[in-house]
């Protein structure tokens, strides 16, 4: 009879992983405190998302946020959870949220050395129809010795210490990117811990799926439309790419990370700067993509090289498998040279 224990007794949890990385880096433990607090917020949001219908958390709260999106009740709850947990970590000094017009400066007695930019509930327009939604975050180290201010958040994505997202889907998955690579953790509700399920994730160099909202095609740059035409009707006679678009960035990005392919949210005539926000959507996801061997670009430059000028700045994005993004860039540069 096989000697299988009914329970794993040496579990690789997110907390354990982060502590190990901190020990290797001979850190102070502040980043571990921060990530543990963020995890608690994510667990609470995951629980709220699953109870939303019963707890009457669906629907609109009756206002719009700074970027013009209608604010849902779950948005407000999620935002408050993340802010309160990060404040209580004693590891942050400045917080930037999609839901707040201005940066949040942490009170002096609770300050640490990190700046966190986050979207507490990405894809919240999909809440009422039960489509997967998520939380996105990027963590920077405060560089100046001055009093904390909004300027501390205006760092390029290359300066990220850690970034990632939580996906509230058929299970709750947390994807964390750090210098050591990209690792995936799944929430085990029976013990309330994130368990490592994929270590040092690497993307396929080329996929067979493209993802964007083609409803805006009439306003796209000609380079986008030429690229899409190539994917649908390959000139070499190969199989066309499949089209997949959920409309929840975290869901579309996670599929791209797992299966390969390309995700596009380009600029168009109505949104010449794109629609996704640089600090708490584009940069964290671009960081994950690059650490997993993919690419992330605006067309003109790498997303992680953009130096932000304001906290709710927007950027067009094309990201995914390296060969797919390179193929797009060849077409984009050809059109730009005309």
Curated annotation (Swiss-Prot):
According to the UniProt record, one GO cellular component term is: cytoplasm
According to the UniProt entry, its GO molecular function terms are: AMP binding; fructose 1,6-bisphosphate 1-phosphatase activity; identical protein binding; metal ion binding; monosaccharide binding; RNA polymerase II-specific DNA-binding transcription factor binding
Binding of substrate occurs at 122-125, 213-216, 244-249, 265, 275-277
Keyword list (alphabetical) reads:
Acetylation, Allosteric enzyme, Carbohydrate metabolism, Gluconeogenesis, Hydrolase, Magnesium, Metal-binding, Phosphoprotein
KW Acetylation (keyword) present: yes
Catalyzed reactions: beta-D-fructose 1,6-bisphosphate + H2O = beta-D-fructose 6-phosphate + phosphate
| Entry cofactors | Mg(2+)
Question: Between which residues do disulfide bridges form?
Answer: none
The UniProt transmembrane annotation reads none
Q: Could you say which residues bind Mg(2+) 3 here?
A: 119, 122, 281
Instruction: Relate the induction remark in this record.
Output: Up-regulated in pancreas by obesity and dietary fat intake and in diabetic animals.
Cofactor descriptive note: Binds 3 Mg(2+) ions per subunit.
> Which tissues show it?
Detected in pancreatic beta-cell lines MIN6 and beta-TC and in liver (at protein level). Preferentially expressed in liver, with lower levels detected in pancreatic islets and intestine, and very low levels in blood, muscle, brain and spleen.
Database matches in InterPro entries: FBPase_C_dom, FBPase_class-1, FBPase_N, FBPtase, Fructose_bisphosphatase_AS
Residues annotated as carrying N-acetylalanine in the record are 2
Write down the top EC class of this protein. Answer: hydrolase
Q: Which pathway is it part of?
A: Carbohydrate biosynthesis; gluconeogenesis
**Modified residue annotations for N6-succinyllysine:** 151
Q: Which residues bind Mg(2+) 1?
A: 69, 98
Activity regulation, short description: Subject to complex allosteric regulation. The enzyme can assume an active R-state, or an inactive T-state. Intermediate conformations may exist. AMP acts as an allosteric inhibitor. AMP binding affects the turnover of bound substrate and not the affinity for substrate. Fructose 2,6-bisphosphate acts as a competitive inhibitor. Fructose 2,6-bisphosphate and AMP have synergistic effects.
Entry-linked PANTHER family: FRUCTOSE-1,6-BISPHOSPHATASE 1, FRUCTOSE-1,6-BISPHOSPHATASE-RELATED
Q: Describe, as the record does, how this protein assembles with itself and its partners.
A: Homotetramer.
Described by its record, this protein's role is as follows:
Catalyzes the hydrolysis of fructose 1,6-bisphosphate to fructose 6-phosphate in the presence of divalent cations, acting as a rate-limiting enzyme in gluconeogenesis. Plays a role in regulating glucose sensing and insulin secretion of pancreatic beta-cells. Appears to modulate glycerol gluconeogenesis in liver. Important regulator of appetite and adiposity; increased expression of the protein in liver after nutrient excess increases circulating satiety hormones and reduces appetite-stimulating neuropeptides and thus seems to provide a feedback mechanism to limit weight gain.
The UniProt similarity line reads: Belongs to the FBPase class 1 family.
Name of the protein this chain belongs to: Fructose-1,6-bisphosphatase 1
């Amino acid at each position: 009879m096989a000697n299988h224990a009914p329970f794993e007794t040496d579990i690789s949890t997110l907390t354990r992983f982060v502590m190990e990385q901190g020990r290797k880096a001979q850190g102070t433990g502040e980043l571990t405190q921060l990530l543990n607090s963020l995890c608690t917020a994510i667990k609470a949001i995951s629980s709220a998302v699953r109870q939303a219908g019963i707890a009457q958390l669906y629907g609109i709260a009756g206002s719009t946020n700074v970027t013009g999106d209608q604010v849902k009740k779950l948005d407000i709850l999620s935002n408050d959870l993340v802010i309160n947990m990060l404040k209580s970590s004693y590891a942050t000094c400045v917080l930037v949220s999609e839901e707040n017009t201005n940066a949040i400066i942490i009170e002096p007695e609770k300050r640490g050395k990190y700046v966190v930019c986050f979207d507490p509930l990405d894809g919240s327009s999909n809440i009422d129809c039960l489509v997967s939604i998520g939380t996105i975050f990027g963590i920077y180290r405060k560089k100046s010795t001055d009093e904390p201010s909004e300027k501390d958040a205006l760092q390029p994505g290359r300066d990220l210490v850690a970034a990632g997202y939580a996906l509230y889907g058929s299970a709750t998955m947390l994807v964390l990117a750090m210098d050591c690579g990209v690792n995936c953790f799944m929430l085990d509700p029976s013990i309330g811990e994130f368990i490592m399920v994929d270590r040092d994730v690497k993307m396929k160099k080329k996929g067979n799926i493209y993802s964007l909202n083609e409803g805006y095609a009439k306003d796209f740059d000609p380079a986008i439309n030429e690229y899409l035409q190539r994917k649908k009707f390959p000139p070499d006679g190969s199989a066309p790419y499949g089209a997949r678009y959920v409309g929840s960035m975290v869901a579309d990005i996670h599929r791209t990370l797992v299966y390969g392919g390309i995700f596009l949210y380009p600029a168009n005539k109505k949104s010449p700067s794109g629609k996704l926000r640089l600090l708490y959507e584009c940069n964290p996801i671009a960081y994950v993509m690059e650490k997993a061997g993919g690419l992330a670009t605006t067309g003109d430059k790498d997303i992680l090289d953009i130096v932000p000028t304001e906290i709710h700045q927007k950027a067009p994005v094309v990201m995914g498998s390296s060969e797919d993004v390179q193929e797009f860039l060849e077409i984009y540069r050809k059109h730009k040279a005309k």
